[in-house]
Amino acid sequence: MPKHSKRYLEAKKLVDRTKYYDLDEAVELVKKTATAKFDETIELHIQTGIDYRKPDQHIRGTIVLPHGTGKEVKVLVFARGEKAKEAQEAGADYVGAEDLVEKIEKEGFLDFDVAIATPDMMRVIGRLGKILGPRGLMPSPKSGTVTNEVAEAVKEFKKGRIEVRTDKTGNIHIPVGKKSFDNEKIKENVISAIKQIMQMKPAGVKGQFIKKAVLASTMGPGIKLNLQSILNE
């Protein structure tokens, strides 16, 4: 088992592991347990009831948080001509075509958080699947990152649109703010995220879709949420 720091163990004492916290109390507590010397990210971890062995139950999509994540998002766009110009004007950090593909392949360039591509670029960037796929960076129509509306996509991801996907255990992990955020902003982000994820329930999932939700800071312990109180908001 990994050894936890003294700071983590002290923070853990503040959390009742048997309790499901209402959101107001959970947000207060997650900030209290975020004791690192940097502005910790507040994360939402969701356990779903999907069967990961069934590909039609995998979840991949995007949601928009009303107050963003507090993180500066670096956006890369694969596009040519007019679409490349639109992406640049919308604020994309990197725009290119074959030149960017080569930079990623040969130099291992990965200094970006989101990659967007116009549909005509997919045959060019297909060979990047092995590099970008495992990192969750490969453009995909499901996540809204393969589109001709590049300017709109760039602006949305810069503003706070984030990708949601289930890992191999059927869990979802997303940032919902920073410790420095007002409590109300974190709370509104959490409510919005859970309600949007509820809309992504695959048709084949039987029984309860969201089984458990936990709030935690980067270096802090998990705080279980009372889901019913959130869904009633």
Curated annotation (Swiss-Prot):
Keywords, ordered alphabetically: Repressor, Ribonucleoprotein, Ribosomal protein, RNA-binding, rRNA-binding, Translation regulation, tRNA-binding
Cited InterPro entries: Ribosom_uL1_bac-type, Ribosomal_uL1, Ribosomal_uL1-like, Ribosomal_uL1/biogenesis, Ribosomal_uL1_3-a/b-sand, Ribosomal_uL1_CS
Example of a GO cellular component annotation carried by this entry: large ribosomal subunit
Gene3D superfamilies, sorted: 3.30.190.20, 3.40.50.790
Claim: Calcium is one of the keywords in the record: no
GO BP terms in the entry: regulation of translation; translation
The keyword Ion transport is assigned to this record: no
Lineage top rank: taxon: Bacteria
GO molecular function, one term: rRNA binding
PROSITE patterns given in the database record: RIBOSOMAL_L1
A matching Pfam family: Ribosomal_L1
Family: Belongs to the universal ribosomal protein uL1 family.
Assembly and interaction partners: Part of the 50S ribosomal subunit.
Described purpose of this protein according to its UniProt entry: Binds directly to 23S rRNA. The L1 stalk is quite mobile in the ribosome, and is involved in E site tRNA release.
Name the UniProt record assigns to this protein: Large ribosomal subunit protein uL1
Species in which this protein is naturally found: Thermotoga neapolitana (strain ATCC 49049 / DSM 4359 / NBRC 107923 / NS-E)
Lineage of origin: Bacteria, Thermotogati, Thermotogota, Thermotogae, Thermotogales
